[in-house]
């Protein structure tokens, strides 16, 4: 008899883990709260560093889960720990007795309207990174011939007042990627990036930063934006301080893009509350061991993959999903031997 594995969350981590568990011979039940699989990847256009299509990447991931029991628009209604299994009642009325559970609930984006000084939801010209990516994906750009566009890094990240002092890890690279892409669409526009510190830490990240400056002429201003105001002509005046020169600056823009950071998924936290999963100070879930067992929760048979334990890049998420599948396989086999 095949062991049942419940995977909660149908983003990249859930898809990759489900595919690996299916190949190992397990009966995988994958649930996703949205109407479509893919999580945030389903809303993206091109991916860093190679500019590959997010659509094609998602298609490759979903092709691998053929044969997996997959339920969209479904959430965990109740979850209980039994002896060495989990009893889950799903919102579609199905009950699952799972030998192991993988939580891959991903992340939520910070609600940019909470930073009122930036004017999101107030001024038409202020959008988020997700809004811009949607425009790229749908090929419906919001402006005709803009003269200047700005990007604000760390919106809702590294911000005590916003309740998140931690770095969201991917925002700097995403901002630089999108700044380059916006120059491809509007080559005559001036593009500015307002940043605290540029954290271009991964392979090819520094190359992208240099390319942004040398090939696209993007201006990087180290400093916090303090105020955004709409002018009579509908353009935006941005006040900031250039911390390298210690001088206040004002820039007039046609559009301002806010790089909204990652926050813990509320859907994931709802699951966690049902079985008292522990979280870190930032709200993301705690692993059994942050070095040796990051995919394991502190409960037997309950595992994590992806951004539910903290901000991650897509490659890191996929690597972690494969690792989580192996950890689940080892756990099941060890339990089988004990019986």
Where are these regions (language model features)?
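Residues forming the flavin
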Residues: 1-339
């Amino acid at each position: 008899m095949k062991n049942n594995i419940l995977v909660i969350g149908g983003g990249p981590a859930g898809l990759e883990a489900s595919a690996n568990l299916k190949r190992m011979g397990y009966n995988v039940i994958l649930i996703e709260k949205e109407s479509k699989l893919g999580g945030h990847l389903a809303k993206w256009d091109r991916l860093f560093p190679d500019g590959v299509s997010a659509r094609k990447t998602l298609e490759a991931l979903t092709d691998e889960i053929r044969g997996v029991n997959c339920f969209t628009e479904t959430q965990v209604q109740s979850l209980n720990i039994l002896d060495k299994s989990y009893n889950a009642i799903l919102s579609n009325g199905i009950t699952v007795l799972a030998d192991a559970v993988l939580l891959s609930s991903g992340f939520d984006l910070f609600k940019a309207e909470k930073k009122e000084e930036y004017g999101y939801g107030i001024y038409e010209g202020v959008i988020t990174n997700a809004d811009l990516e949607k425009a790229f994906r749908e090929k419906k750009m919001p402006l005709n011939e803009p003269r200047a566009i700005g990007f604000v890094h760390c919106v809702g990240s590294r911000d005590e007042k916003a309740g998140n002092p931690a770095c969201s890890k991917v925002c700097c690279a995403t901002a630089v990627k999108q700044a380059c892409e916006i120059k491809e669409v509007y080559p005559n526009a001036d593009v500015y990036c307002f940043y605290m510190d540029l954290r271009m830490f991964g392979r090819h990240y520094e190359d992208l930063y240099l390319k942004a400056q040398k090939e696209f002429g993007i201006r990087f201003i180290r400093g916090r934006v303090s105020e955004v105001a709409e002018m009579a002509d509908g353009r935006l005046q941005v006040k900031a301080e250039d911390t390298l020169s210690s001088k206040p600056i004002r820039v007039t823009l046609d559009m301002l893009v806010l790089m909204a950071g990652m926050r813990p998924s509320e859907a994931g936290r709802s699951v966690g509350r049902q079985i008292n999963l522990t979280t870190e100070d930032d709200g993301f879930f705690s692993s059994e061991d942050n070095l040796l067992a990051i995919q394991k929760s502190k409960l037997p048979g309950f595992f994590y993959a992806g951004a539910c334990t903290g901000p991650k890049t897509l490659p890191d998420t996929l690597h972690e999903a494969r690792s989580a599948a192996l950890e689940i396989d080892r756990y099941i086999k060890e339990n089988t031997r004990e019986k």
